[in-house]
């Protein structure tokens, strides 16, 4: 089933368990605008609502989405190419097959790439990971905690989890051990750490992290 009738990239998907809908986000390859689309699954079939833009202007890059169960909101993070590639979050609200977005909130005032998100159900927080491409920690893997309230979000302090050239970050939440697990590739001039896993635990009232050693 075609859900977007032109070139579409940077695709990510999440599931809204309250609305029983999937949310797909990505970038139009022609105008680079970021769009969100709601999907309804019925048996082995799926249907879609209309695409709604969450990023216009120069568009979006490296999109990711996750569902925050406590807030009952879908969270979208993307690189805002209209704002120097800064990692930016918008909170989405679903109504049937329609989707709308709150105001943009910048995660950091520097470019980011390999952007991802995951929901920590133990702490009811949305966890964002990205490569910091613009600060003194350029190319370092970075993680930050987000607290969703309505269509707003606030952030804790960003923590570096990889002080090497980092890429291909992906993450999941281990509900048995209440840990965020990151998988990523990292390298330096000696290629001493190429494929790593790092387990992180939220501390300090759910706005900070402690991380174990990569293996």
Residue ranges and their predicted role:
Residues 1-215:
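Extracellular, repeat-based ectodomains that mediate carbohydrate processing or recognition
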